[in-house]
Amino acid sequence: MANVSSFQRKIAKIKIGIASPQSILEASNGEVKKPETLNHRTGKPEKDGLFCEKIFGPVKDYECACGKYKGKKYEGTVCERCGVKVESKEARRRKIGHIELATPISHIWYLKSSPSILSIILNIGVKDLENIIYYGSKRVIERAYLTLPGPENENLGYLPGEILYQREYEIYDEYLDLRVEPAVKIVSVKGMPVADIDGKVEIKSELTHTERELNWIIIRDDTGVERKYPVFEGSSIMVENGQEVEKGTPLADRFLFEEDYLTQKEYSLFLEYYPGSIEVERDIERDTPIVVITDIDKRFAKRIDKKIGDILLEDEARAYEEVMKVLNSKIKEERENVIDKELVSEIEFPEKKFEKGTKITQEVLNELQEFGVKDLVAKEEDGTEKIFQINRYEKFEYGYGAEAIQKLLTKIDLEVLKARLESELEKLDRKSQKSVKILRRLKLVKDFIKSGNQPEWLITNIIPVIPPDLRPLIQIDGGRFAATDLNDLYRKVINRNNRLRKLLEMEAPEIIVRNEKRILQQAVDSLFYNGRVGKPMTDRNRRPLRSLTDLLKGKKGRFRRNLLGKRVDYSGRAVIAVGPDLKIHECGLPKKMALELFKPFVLAELLRDSNVASKSARKFKKTIIEKEMPEAWEVLEEVIKGHPVLLNRAPTLHRVSIQAFIPKLIEGNAIRLHPLVCPPFNADFDGDQMAIHIPLSNIAQAESKFLMLSRYNIISPANGKPLSMPGKDIIAGAYYLTMHEDEKFKNLKVPTKVSELGKNGYVKHIFSEDLEATYAYEYLKIVDSDIYLQDGKLIWKKSDLPLHEPVAFRYKDGSILKTTIGKIIFNEEVPEDLRDYTQKMDKKNLKELIFNTFEKHGIDRTADLLDSIKDFGFHYATLSGLTISIRDVLVSPKREELIEESKGEVLRIESLYEEGYLTDNERYKEIIKIWESATAKVTEETAKTYRKYTFNPIWMMIESGARGNIDQLKQLAGMRGLMADPSGKIIEVPITSNFKNGLSELEFFTSTHGSRKGSADTALRTSTAGYLTRRLVDVAQSITITEEDCGTDKGIEARELWADDSKIENLSDFLFGRVLAKDVLDPETKEVIFNPQADKKYERGIILKEKDAQFLANYVKEIPVSKEKTIKIEDMPKDSYLESLEDVQVEGKVLIKKGEEITEEAIEEAFLHGIQKLDVKEYTAVDYVYSGEDLKVEIDGKTVTLLKYQERIDLKVSKVLEKHGIKTVTVRPSIFIRSPLTCESENGLCAKCYGMDLSNYKLVNRGEAVGIIAAQSIGEPGTQLTMRTFHTGGIATTSDITQGLPRAEELFEARKKTKGPEGEFSKTKGIVRAIERDTENKRGRRLKIIIENSDGELESYEADYRTKAVVEEGDKVLAGQRLTTGNIKPRNILKELGVGPLANYLLSEIKKIYAEQGVDIHDKHFEIIIRQMINKVEIIDGGDTDFMPGDLVSYGKVQKINEEILEENSYITENRELVVGKKLAKRVIIPAEDEEEEEDKIFEQGTEITEEILNQIIETNIKEIEVYEEYKEITTEEGKTHLVGTSKKYLINPKDTIKYERRLLRITKASLEREGWLSAASFQQTVQILTEAAIEGKVDRLKGLKENVIVGQPIPAGTGLKLYADQNYEVVQPEKEAEAAQEKSVG
């Protein structure tokens, strides 16, 4: 019974960042060098392998690998033989290793994120970046050249006949003299040299101009005719010198080689001798490796116009390298030539000055070089001046692979880059594409600086190896092992890495090494994110291996499967059965199950009693369960006494799907459930299973008992109506008990004299109290009832006092009531003030009774009443013997007559159609109308037939509401009616048969369409609804009640909800459960409305209960439109609109003109001038809501609506009414209520804006997770609706969830593209003046609607040709009102009318979907979701914040930041004075105008700020500088000094505020746009979110619910709120409670 202080949250925040190679090494316990896992002979982990005990810890608890040290006493010892540290085997779950890679590799998340992080930071295209990292090549088409002999080429190392490609040649050509000739590539060679004549062979050799060998085969015949055959080097000559050959003899195997290159001259030669035999290519297509410049001398960069990070072909890079060598050799010559020359001008440095005319010696030259002089001007011997280059180009480095990228990243100075980007941004238009690109890069640079991450960490040569127990090898049958995919992926990385290391040691050719580096990069990619680039790595069954990313993301990832959905101990599962004898807060728990669940508790009690030693406790444990010790049952009874258990039924759609019960031990194997808690669980007893959980800690038990117990969850949090409602048998029983025969009950009178009792027309019995009546009934039932045999027949003599017999009854107030015995019995259990002895207790009346009991007597009395009703219901349902047979189905005699009449009507319509009086569409509509009317009449006649038979079982079921409805009765005994085809169109031939008479074949076939569609819908839409619920929960999960009152004076105006001329919600329902945002004023007296019945004034802050809501909704008054009166100056009302009836003059000066509004300023001026009274006209109806029927007048023969129902009357409307002679109007007060939409709490909502907690009718408590309740309230019926489709059997009805659910999703997801044509809405308040169609166009005629607004201007609206107008000429329309059919895009409403009308539209439309299905959900739940959808703004210009254009940020946050910026800006002048004389704590960089010509100006840390320095910084538009407030100098070991101390940032240039636009977000997007990265990553796009969060070094402050569940601590909602964290709880057993009470009473 120890006190438990419960909800201390241990983790305040979680930061994510990039792991540097150094940090991985520090965390690692050793390097994994081998790919092996376990030794196949010994089964032990291999040393240095993936399961090595030395690295990851021992396999056996407190035992080293070789077994030298065993036991906990050696803990911490490192075995000198095997090197394993003696510790718990749990270490294998937390110790990590590492793999040292032979070459750096890129992390795939940073390369392939969208947009790519590496690409942005380096400003290199993603494609080029990938090509470099994966050693790719580029396909180029270019000309080729061959080198010619000559000293120039030889000096460059080029031999004659070497190939140069165009880009390479162009580089050489620009800087060097290189002799080349254009070349062609031999694509194909046809044939071989064959002798054309007989003759003698002569072979000659010569060199071509490219110094390649050319053989001439010459054949000369006897007549001196000769033929020449040129053959290129490398060809095999098949004849010899002097050989005689015949015609047709082959002379060589070929004359040219394919893929060879020839100069134009060589090609012409061969073309001459072998015409048509050679095919060549001049533009050559080839793949060539690409490289990136990693370092370059600034002067050389300028000379060749390249910079670090530029992408080149490998050939180009080599050419530049050669060029640099040649240029450097020229510089060497110039250095030698400058010796002994004289300087033309002086050169000065702080350290030394070189005078004009100084002779340049080797020593002077060296000094100048050291000072960084690159060029100098000196005099030649002839007196001319010449520029000499004296400093050679130092470096030109390039490379490929991640290694090259790492070099680039290492070179980035983030501070300098930031200064340069900011400087560049200043010169650009913020909206330009280039500006956005720079902004994105700048944001990334700032993120790196802020987080402390280094860009080079994106490339690593150390990768961590996760602990082996997180990637285990599991032995399966047959001695084989099942391995985790990660082991295979690690194995591949290690194998490839080891192979690369060997190749590097062997100094293998570059091409082999490069290939090996590429496949190592791919192996690491697959380990991190398999399948993201190229083909995924697969196992032998071609199944892609699950990489580290796959372990995180998706439904089966770490977040959703293991962190948000854990398995729970102390739980069980069993089938449920009904427990009619249970109380509402009890459940039946099978004994065996209870013993298993409470085993530790039972064991603890038994051990305490029997003093068993701890060693034998384990044996004892088995004995308890296996042998079922008798003592165990006794202890179990004690243990479970008052110990609540939680029952849960999947799917857990809303919070009442988990409730607490007090268990009762029962025999059998099924959990017994109270029948009245089935509705919230949506459970039935056809094989459903439920899970049971045991709350262990005292606090968990306290929560279960006081918050989750089923008796406290009777009222629905979705709508405030009872959830645990009696149903089926219980209603039938209660109805049977309280029913009567209507005619008899009506006709029998209550006697006024004793003599009248029992006489004709009077009741037979009268009772003085309910107990007397019950006794009499029970006694007569026994005494009077008898069964005896008479004339061979069984005769049952009935009681003289049946249950439904009308009797008289004297009530406590002395009045005599007419009732029945059944009603008296029923009312015994009802609270006295709610007893009604005249009503039949059907479903509706029972619901009302339960609700009234809850309102007046509280939840406990309601729970007791429910139990009583349950007992009565089952008892009397059993006694009633309710059954149905085919004979109980009664068919109306008028049925056939009505059907035949309708058939005649249809024939008449058909003949009119055939005669051409009707179109096909009109004929169809008329026929449908006839059959709809016929079905309604048949239904009415059938109901009339049944009403005559009160005790007909079918009618009893329907009338009581126990089961079935009039529509099903219509199908059984009337006619099935019209059906819909699969597309939803109504089939015009109805089913005239009913189920009693049976359907014909055609009718049966017709009826199958709907049923089939219903079944298909059920299957398809259940998942859709589930996913919708998930998204809703995700978007709203972090909304909890965080404070009592946010203090806002804003609110929304209460109104009835209408959509398309159909009322969706009454005003009273809209008001119920809300808090007033303003006082509600009486339209007549202008005073706060007072309700005498409730003794309540409706002032700001009052919470509206149901009766209050009904009172205010019905509070209407008829008041004059305007009235004239004289008012004293001091009595002038502030809230009214007043106009002066005359000019008010003082000394000739007009203070107030006639007809002008009287303002407060005018009143003050009049008062100062001594005016006492004013004659005014008061427009009394202004700001009140019109609540009469639409007010229409005739103008020029046309009907025009002046005032619409629910329109808020303004001044212009009042004047129009006055103009048309309307004196009075019926209005209701303007009621403004607090709403989640207008709440100004920074996090979550405040209690006042949320209002009443609908499950207990009190103001909501702080900590309530209202977001999740809202999401569940909306999502749960979504699933229900999809499942209910099939109950109608596919009958043609106007609404069906098929339209409902996709429409709800369409609205919540705020689709940009909607199905069907787009509808139009009015953007202003006005009157429709014209509706017309445009001239015909290709697709049809566009609809045009012209509206005159309240200022008299005409506005034209054009709508899609497929739409129809829903308004008529003369109608009044309000802003946001629909004008045409078709779907209105919510985004357009936001754009044109703003956030308020958008929220109103979404609320009406979403509410309509649910209302059509008869689902009641309170508006506040929808408002919470809508709040999340409209809570964000899109940044247009981030100003001087870190926000990027396109970023989505909460509206409140942006407002707050802008306010802070404006406040900071006001201190700039002061700040500028304060910083002068202080020292910089952080260096300030002023970027050079031209990076290549000038150096950046850098004021280092410790620089003292002078006026001059400050002005330079201000001119550069640097916003902030950081200076030391206090500091001291510290000297390092190297002798350098630097400052340390406290620093402060000062704003010295005004910051720009954020410019933004309000945005409507779909719920999926709104879920992702959260400040906390943990919650967002667990929802969708895990990789993207984690990547960005790591770069930014984001901190999650764990404000939401999901984040806290993930880190395993109480959620900041409910009892997890800090408010309740320090409460102490203790569990007091019932007998101790009694003792405590006794002591108290004695005391």
From Swiss-Prot:
General function of this protein: DNA-dependent RNA polymerase catalyzes the transcription of DNA into RNA using the four ribonucleoside triphosphates as substrates.
Annotated binding of Mg(2+), by residue: 684, 686, 688
Known partners and oligomeric status: The RNAP catalytic core consists of 2 alpha, 1 beta, 1 beta' and 1 omega subunit. When a sigma factor is associated with the core the holoenzyme is formed, which can initiate transcription.
Record-linked Pfam families: RNA_pol_Rpb1_1, RNA_pol_Rpb1_2, RNA_pol_Rpb1_3, RNA_pol_Rpb1_4, RNA_pol_Rpb1_5
EC number: 2.7.7.6
InterPro entries documented for this protein: DNA-dir_RpoC_beta_prime, DNA-dir_RpoC_beta_prime_bact, RNA_pol_asu, RNA_pol_N, RNA_pol_Rpb1_1, RNA_pol_Rpb1_3, RNA_pol_Rpb1_3_sf, RNA_pol_Rpb1_4
Lineage: Bacteria, Thermotogati, Thermotogota, Thermotogae, Petrotogales
Signal peptide: none
Keyword Nucleotidyltransferase attributed: yes
Keyword rRNA processing: no
Cofactor(s) demanded: Mg(2+); Zn(2+)
GO biological process assignments: DNA-templated transcription
Keywords, sorted A to Z: DNA-directed RNA polymerase, Magnesium, Metal-binding, Nucleotidyltransferase, Transcription, Transferase, Zinc
Cofactor stoichiometry and binding remark: Binds 1 Mg(2+) ion per subunit.
Binding positions (Zn(2+) 1): 64, 66, 79, 82
Reactions catalysed according to its record: RNA(n) + a ribonucleoside 5'-triphosphate = RNA(n+1) + diphosphate
Any one GO cellular component localisation term in the record: DNA-directed RNA polymerase complex
Enzyme class: transferase
Name of this chain's protein: DNA-directed RNA polymerase subunit beta'
Gene that this sequence comes from: rpoC
Residues binding Zn(2+) 2, per UniProt: 1046, 1239, 1246, 1249
Family statement: Belongs to the RNA polymerase beta' chain family.
